[in-house]
Amino acid sequence: MTNLPKVTVRDLAESGVHFGHKISRWNAKIAPYIYGVHQENRIHIIDLRKTLPLLQVAMKVLYDVAFQGGRILFVGTKFQAFDIIASEAIRCGQYYVNHRWLGGMLTNWGTVSSSIKTLMQYEKILNDEDSILTKKELGNIEKKKQKLDKALGGIREMGAIPDILFIIDTNKEHIAVKEAKKLGIPIVAILDTNSDPDGITYLIPGNDDSRKSIELYCKLATDSILAGIESSLAKSGVKIDDIRGDEFIQEKEDGIVQTKRRRSKVYKEEEREVVTNEDESR
């Protein structure tokens, strides 16, 4: 029995998930998930009775991937989402892209891996107390390091292409969608009334612009992933009470899921609040 987070139609409504775009901006393919039109504002209203079961399916999928030790990549680069994407991905020990998606991030993974190695080399140089480089040279390396870290920091420990993507706004992240489709990587995505559902493996009709809505989606995704990890740990005989201060990951070795412990990247609530506030001043 899975221990998925609970969510109701009321929860969705209170977070504004039902508010779509102006009717002039709609994508006709999303029509099956539209309830009607708000006559005063002339925006489409999303049918939350259809959103809820699709959301629950997506949550179960994320749970299953996490249970099997899969890699999950959170993608959301729009201003309303970028800090939420990072903090929630980190909270469950997964990976994220929250600034510009670089073309080939999935389809040219070899080059991306090389760039990640370069990033780590820069960090090693900058942390070398015995470095003979000049202040100017170190400054140039610091700038290059910051640029790479902004683009790749959220996937530096991913190790390989992800098993599934969780995307906020498929229109903005169309390159990520295209690359995932090309490689056959499943996609869980929030689709607003101006979005194309074609090729999205697990779609969730909903408002992809409201921070409150985005916070709800990401929290549910993260809680589902954590539930999957905890169930996997319990099956491995690890006591959940013992994982405080540590992060457990599941890695596949020779077809077998191995449970390993590594330094936690999970924010404490107070730490997350500080980071979020700093990001919002961007």
From Swiss-Prot:
Q: Which SUPFAM superfamilies match?
A: Ribosomal protein S2
Q: InterPro entries from the xrefs?
A: Ribosomal_uS2, Ribosomal_uS2_bac/mit/plastid, Ribosomal_uS2_CS, Ribosomal_uS2_flav_dom_sf
Point out the coiled-coil segments of this chain. Answer: none
Please identify the protein, giving its name as recorded: Small ribosomal subunit protein uS2
Keywords, comma-separated and alphabetical: Ribonucleoprotein, Ribosomal protein
- In this chain, composition skew of type Basic and acidic residues spans 266-282
Gene Ontology terms, MF aspect: structural constituent of ribosome
**Gene Ontology biological process terms, A to Z:** translation
The answer on whether this UniProt entry bears the keyword Ribosomal protein reads yes
What are the record's GO terms for cellular component? cytosolic small ribosomal subunit
Its taxonomic path starts at: Bacteria, Pseudomonadati, Pseudomonadota, Alphaproteobacteria, Rickettsiales
Q: Which family does it belong to?
A: Belongs to the universal ribosomal protein uS2 family.
- Which Pfam families does this one have? Ribosomal_S2
Kindly indicate whether the keyword Ribosomal protein belongs to this entry.
Answer: yes
- The record's region (Disordered) falls at 260-282
